[in-house]
């Protein structure tokens, strides 16, 4: 299987191959060629190993990534992919590894930090995706409200229950053909992201006998997930700002058999093990990784005065939405986009799409659990059935 790469006068890569798998390998190789330092940094962040070359300032994130079980969750989600999607993602990582071996040495950052490019596993893109989006929902705000309650009292929490009067965020525009001079619909996506160098997106054109798509790819992730144009249909997203992660106040204790957590039915086993974070220019840091029936403990622990666990959909369901990414590339109409997004999970997005037949789509895509309204404000008691997810 062969592939070819052409760069236009703006340096945008146009990749063409004789099969979808060969194209995935070419896209992975191109990501490694153009963004080697970026994707390797994201891999280490997802695995909780970035302090090994970034130093003590990265320990905080590495500790969270390990305690939240980001890499382990990615492995679970990869194991549940359908066979075709798993092969597609695997082909992409093969390309990444080939590209890193060929050209990563050209990136000055590797020489400056002494970092040697590592090996991507088939599940690594899922870990990078999860790590990139784990803070997109509301659990950081819930942690903030816990701090408010501790400092100012429970009555002050309602003062921080909503955003302020100023608006912010991405926007998307979807105009029916009935309101345009051409009679065709207009779609415009306007993502508002932090200014980063390199940017969070990479313009790319992907073509093979099965599809022909141009758009914005996320380096380290196969396909064109967020903003794409596939000849007869186009799609774009904004963050839905949905609340789909919950925090639980846990009661933990050590026993001769390990760690237990107090749940709705009393004391129950929790898993616990230790991991070591290597730190450039510092001493190694030992982290205890504990998980209850609600989710991984991300604040406190068995020996701390309190503990808080994080429950997030991919950890519960083993679904991250990569099956949707492969289907999006093959979309021809807004109905195809709609069906593909039924498999979307993380993060929760607002999606707009339009096609050349005049079709329009505006929907929310992603996994949002059904639970008590109180879960949306702050951490809730793990031992009360009322706060359990109902679906």
Which role fits each region the language model picked out?
Residues 2-197, 209, 215-216, 221-224, ...:
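Substrate-recognition/specificity elements adjacent to catalytic centers across diverse enzyme folds
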């Amino acid at each position: 299987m062969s592939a070819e790469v052409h760069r236009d006068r703006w340096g945008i890569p146009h990749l063409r191959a004789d099969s979808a798998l060969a194209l995935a390998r070419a896209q992975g190789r191109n990501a490694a060629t153009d963004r080697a330092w970026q994707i390797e940094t994201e891999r280490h962040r997802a695995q909780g190993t970035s302090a090994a070359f970034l130093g003590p300032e990265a320990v905080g994130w590495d500790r969270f990534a390990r305690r939240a079980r980001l890499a382990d969750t990615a492995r679970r989600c990869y194991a549940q992919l359908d066979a075709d999607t798993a092969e597609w993602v695997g082909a992409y990582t093969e390309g990444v590894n080939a590209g890193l071996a060929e050209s990563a040495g050209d990136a000055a950052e590797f020489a400056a930090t002494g970092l040697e490019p590592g090996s991507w596993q088939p599940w690594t893109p899922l870990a990078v995706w999860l790590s990139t989006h784990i803070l997109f929902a509301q659990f950081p705000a819930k942690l903030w409200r816990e701090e408010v309650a501790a400092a100012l009292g429970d009555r002050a929490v309602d003062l921080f229950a909503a955003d302020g009067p100023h608006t912010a965020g991405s926007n998307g525009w979807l105009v029916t053909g009935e309101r345009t001079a051409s009679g065709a619909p207009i779609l415009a996506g306007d993502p508002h992201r932090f200014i980063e160098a390199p940017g969070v997106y990479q313009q790319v054109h992907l073509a093979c006998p099965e599809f022909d798509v141009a758009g914005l790819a996320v380096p380290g992730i196969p396909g064109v997930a967020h903003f794409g144009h596939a000849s007869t249909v186009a799609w774009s997203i904004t963050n839905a700002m949905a609340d789909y992660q919950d925090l639980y106040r846990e009661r933990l204790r050590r026993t001769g058999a390990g760690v237990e957590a107090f749940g709705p039915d009393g004391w129950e086993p929790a898993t616990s093990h230790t991991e070591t974070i290597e730190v450039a220019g510092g001493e190694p840091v030992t982290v205890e990784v504990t998980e209850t029936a609600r989710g991984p403990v991300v604040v406190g622990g068995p020996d701390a005065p309190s503990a808080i666990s994080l429950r997030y959909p991919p950890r519960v369901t083993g679904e991250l939405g990569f099956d949707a990414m492969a289907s999006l590339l093959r979309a021809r109409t807004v109905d195809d986009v709609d069906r593909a997004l039924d498999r979307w999970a993380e993060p929760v997005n607002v999606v707009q799409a339009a096609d050349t037949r005049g079709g329009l789509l505006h929907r929310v895509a992603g996994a949002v659990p059904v639970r008590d309204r109180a879960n949306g404000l702050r951490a809730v008691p793990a031992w009360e059935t009322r706060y359990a997810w109902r679906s």
